[in-house]
Amino acid sequence: MAKRGKRYQQLLSLIEKGKLYSPKEAVSLVKKLATAKFDETINLAVRLGVDPRHADQQVRGTVVLPYGTGKEKKVLVFAEGEKAQEAREAGADYVGGEDLVKQIESGWLDFDVAIATPDIMGTLKIPSRLGKILGPRGLMPNPKTGTVTNDIAKAVKEYKAGRVEFRTDRYGIVHVPIGKASFSEEALYKNLMTVLGTLLRLKPAAAKGQYFKSIYISPSMGPSVPIDTKNIADLIKQEEAA
């Protein structure tokens, strides 16, 4: 493994070896670790006690971060007629049908989220025509993540406001951006606890033993801060009841 630079080593020294931090302590510390010359993204990585090789243990969903991600998302909508108008009024960046499919087939991918109405998925044969292009990039509209829907306006507004998708990778880890280093501690904390609360609600019935195996937050260019998982479920419930 390549040796980390001096700056990284200095930041690493701020993390107490062997300590597991409370969520609020971790948020406070991670802001101090974000010393790059740009507004670093704060990333959350949660290793869950699931076996993603089994379909009934995969964790996938979306969450609307109360303080957003700090990044404006470009939203594309496959829709026609009244639904297309709803999408435009809700703030979608690109709205269309066959024209957009052809653009994507020719290599254009200047968007972050693709949403579609259920009927247009079939009439334009989107899964068969665009599956190999959008699928590997995580851009394929999907009913499970709310991106195949008749409530186009709601979906567009939520993604513009800070809705993010997540799913377990093959190691059972979920990666979610929870904001920028410039966010207040309160904003990062609320975003963090919102994601953890969503993950807890999505716990598969087949998952056995400890659910939250490990939780880390880190800036784009800095080391990870470990969060104590011991009483995290109780803390999530306290936050939601507050």
Swiss-Prot record:
Binds directly to 23S rRNA. The L1 stalk is quite mobile in the ribosome, and is involved in E site tRNA release. One of its GO terms (molecular function) is rRNA binding. Gene3D superfamilies: 3.30.190.20, 3.40.50.790. This is Large ribosomal subunit protein uL1. Belongs to the universal ribosomal protein uL1 family. Signal peptide: none annotated. One of its GO terms (cellular component) is large ribosomal subunit. GO terms for biological process: regulation of translation; translation. Part of the 50S ribosomal subunit. NCBIfam families: rplA_bact. CDD domains: Ribosomal_L1. InterPro entries: Ribosom_uL1_bac-type, Ribosomal_uL1, Ribosomal_uL1-like, Ribosomal_uL1/biogenesis, Ribosomal_uL1_3-a/b-sand.
